[in-house]
């Protein structure tokens, strides 16, 4: 039957409920138990055994069989599933002569139903509610996909996530774990004295990252504004103001490409601690990820995309110079000649832009030849100053900064610094970024005079980090695409939407 015909038939059934003086969309239902709780409470009930405990359950009908004078419905709620067993004689005695007929003729898979009865385990071992009375709670008008026959089209799963959640229990579990991960990160930080403070989403300067922002316009102020690309600069202002341990977990927006690792709207947690450096922050990140994995998975060992990853062992720490030398044979440490560095890179198959500096070439070698191979947790340390305008100059290595990125399973998971607090150096770097922006670099950092004014009042030695929540969820749920861990990912509208 075509979908429109099914829709028409179900609308007619809804009207039939009204004819029988039954509202197919009542206002509430008094539920006493969840399906999962009943499954746990009566797990030891033997086959054929019944108890007189009265229960009321409610949920969606996900399976349905009517066999003469008995009916078996599968009911799904937020905690799991349980079978409803209807006996025609019992229903007629409790609800009237036509009640079983209405159940048979006027309900469908996808409807919501409430059922009151007692608990029994069938001879075949299925825990069931032996229904004495039922109530239709919502008549569904469109048919739903089933776990077995329905939703396999990936794009439809993302576009109609509500159907995906109904049809695929594993998807619901992913989002439960995501919520737990977020909760545990906040708990971890709160217990260590960090304070979460919200910073603006609408900004007059979109700074804190190398990214292209989304633009909007404030009508009342007559002002072009941007959606934030990071929370960094406002959180540092808070450190200037006296908050020594501060963080924010929230949405970030970047007007960039979409891939299995990138969504224009995503979630990060940024953390800043005064009187710390990037070594302290690496310790914090390592402890945090280990604690979250233990709570969410019950273990610090996990499997992601076929790779066994150990978060319990000390995370590897290696400089970018050393990593590139180990993986490519190209040793750039101490080299100042960009042309020579370019020849060395091209010898291993990396095409370099004319005029690139040694630092830019080093980073390109890392991205193209090393990044994807970092399966076990690895802190890559000490980045070129050219690509890190907000990180503090390295205390001993010229032209490098005290920056790290954490890679797990070939993905960047965290990015942290010893934060640049020298206002003269910071001004010079932002001026260089402004020149690059004027020359056409859309991802160059904007010149933010207010931020410079803030740190001229004094930013204490500070360590900071941003952790990608979506990628962390991908890791801990073994999800291959970022769209699998964002409830409603960004998609191009279909024709007619």
From Swiss-Prot:
Mg(2+) 1 binds at residues 405, 412. GO terms for biological process: lysyl-tRNA aminoacylation. GO terms for cellular component: cytoplasm. Gene3D superfamilies: Bira Bifunctional Protein, Domain 2, Nucleic acid-binding proteins. It catalyses: tRNA(Lys) + L-lysine + ATP = L-lysyl-tRNA(Lys) + AMP + diphosphate. Binds 3 Mg(2+) ions per subunit. Its cofactor is Mg(2+). It holds the Pfam family tRNA_anti-codon. It is found in: Cytoplasm. Keywords: Aminoacyl-tRNA synthetase, ATP-binding, Cytoplasm, Ligase, Magnesium, Metal-binding, Nucleotide-binding, Protein biosynthesis. GO terms for molecular function: ATP binding; lysine-tRNA ligase activity; magnesium ion binding; tRNA binding. The keyword Iron does not apply. It is an enzyme of class 6 (ligase). Mg(2+) 2 binds at residue 412. The keyword Ribonucleoprotein does not apply. Homodimer. Belongs to the class-II aminoacyl-tRNA synthetase family. This is Lysine--tRNA ligase. It comes from Gloeobacter violaceus (strain ATCC 29082 / PCC 7421). The lineage of its organism: Bacteria, Bacillati, Cyanobacteriota, Cyanophyceae, Gloeobacterales.
């Amino acid at each position: 039957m075509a979908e429109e015909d099914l829709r028409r038939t179900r609308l007619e059934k809804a009207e039939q409920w009204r004819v029988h003086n039954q509202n197919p969309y009542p206002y509430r239902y008094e539920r006493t138990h969840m399906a999962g709780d009943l499954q746990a409470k009566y797990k030891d009930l033997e086959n054929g055994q019944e108890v007189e405990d009265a229960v009321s359950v409610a949920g969606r009908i996900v399976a349905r069989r009517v066999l003469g004078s008995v009916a078996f419905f599968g009911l799904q709620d937020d905690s799991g599933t349980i079978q409803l067993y209807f006996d025609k004689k019992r229903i007629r005695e409790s609800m009237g002569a036509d009640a079983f007929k209405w159940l048979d003729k006027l309900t469908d898979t996808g409807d919501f139903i409430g059922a009151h009865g007692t608990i029994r385990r069938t001879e075949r071992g299925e825990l069931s509610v032996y229904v004495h009375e039922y109530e239709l709670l919502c008549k569904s008008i469109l048919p739903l996909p089933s776990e077995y026959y329905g939703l396999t089209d990936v794009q439809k799963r993302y576009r109609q996530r509500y159907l995906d959640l109904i049809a695929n229990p594993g998807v619901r579990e992913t989002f439960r774990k995501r919520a737990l991960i977020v909760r545990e990160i906040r708990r971890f930080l709160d217990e260590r004295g960090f304070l979460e403070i919200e910073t603006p989403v609408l900004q007059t300067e979109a700074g804190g990252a190398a990214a292209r922002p989304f633009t909007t316009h404030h009508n009342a102020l007559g002002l072009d504004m941007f959606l934030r690309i990071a929370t960094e600069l406002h959180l540092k202002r808070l450190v200037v103001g006296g908050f020594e341990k501060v963080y924010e977990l929230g949405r970030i927006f970047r007007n960039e490409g979409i891939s299995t690792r990138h969504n224009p709207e995503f979630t990060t947690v940024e953390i800043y601690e005064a009187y710390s450096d990037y070594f302290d922050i690496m310790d914090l990140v390592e402890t945090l990820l280990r604690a979250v994995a233990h709570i969410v998975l019950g273990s610090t060992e996990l499997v992601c995309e076929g790779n066994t990853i150990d978060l319990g062992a000390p995370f590897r720490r290696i400089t970018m110079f050393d990593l590139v030398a180990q993986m490519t044979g190209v040793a750039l440490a101490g080299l100042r000649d960009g042309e020579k560095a370019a020849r060395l890179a091209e010898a291993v198959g990396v095409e370099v832009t004319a005029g690139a500096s040694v630092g830019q070439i080093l980073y390109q070698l890392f991205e193209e030849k090393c990044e994807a191979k970092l399966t076990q947790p690895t802190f890559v340390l000490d980045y070129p100053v050219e690509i890190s305008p907000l990180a503090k100059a390295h205390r001993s290595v010229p032209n490098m900064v005290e920056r790290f990125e954490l890679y797990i399973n070939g993905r960047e998971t965290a990015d942290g610094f010893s934060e640049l607090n020298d206002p003269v150096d910071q001004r010079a770097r932002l001026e260089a970024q402004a020149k690059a922006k004027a020359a056409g670099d859309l991802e160059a950092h904007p010149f933010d005079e207010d931020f410079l004014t803030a740190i001229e009042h004094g930013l204490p030695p500070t360590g900071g980090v941003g952790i990608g929540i979506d990628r962390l969820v991908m890791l801990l749920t073994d999800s291959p695409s970022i769209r699998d861990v964002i409830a409603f990912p960004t998609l191009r509208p279909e024709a007619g939407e």
